[in-house]
Swiss-Prot record:
It comes from the Bacteria. Homodimer. Binds to DNA and alters its conformation. May be involved in regulation of gene expression, nucleoid organization and DNA protection. InterPro entries: YbaB-like_sf (IPR036894), YbaB/EbfC (IPR004401). It comes from Histophilus somni (strain 2336). This is Nucleoid-associated protein HSM_0308.
Length: 109
């Protein structure tokens, strides 16, 4: 199935990809992404590991309905998570560029 050098080359490629993925995952965990809701009145900043780093609430919202404020915070957090996931996909795509992976192959991230 594999030639003499084919399997060794495949294993070497897999090891290199694993090392690059590990490095990229460490870099991604350090990056920060900000999600917004309410036209920027609520901002939630998370890191690449989806840990919340900061929540900014415009002072004008402090007088408003508590339930609306909670909804906006949740929406901003969800927006931040979506942006973080998009960033992760872009960064990890650079790791696998040039590799002959089968169509539809899902990376473990």
């Amino acid at each position: 199935m594999f030639g003499k050098g084919g399997l060794g080359n495949l294993m070497k490629q897999a090891q290199q990809m694993q090392e690059r993925m590990q490095k990229m995952q460490e870099e991604i965990a350090q990056l920060e992404v900000t999600g917004e809701a309410g036209a920027g009145l609520i901002k939630v900043t998370i890191n690449g590991a989806h840990n919340c780093r900061r929540i900014d609430i415009d002072p004008s919202l402090m007088e408003d309905d508590k339930e609306m404020l909670e909804d906006l915070i949740a929406a901003a957090f969800n927006d931040a998570v979506r942006r973080a996931e998009e960033m992760q996909k872009e960064k990890m795509a650079s790791v696998t560029a040039g590799m002959s992976l089968p169509p539809g192959f899902k990376m473990p991230f």
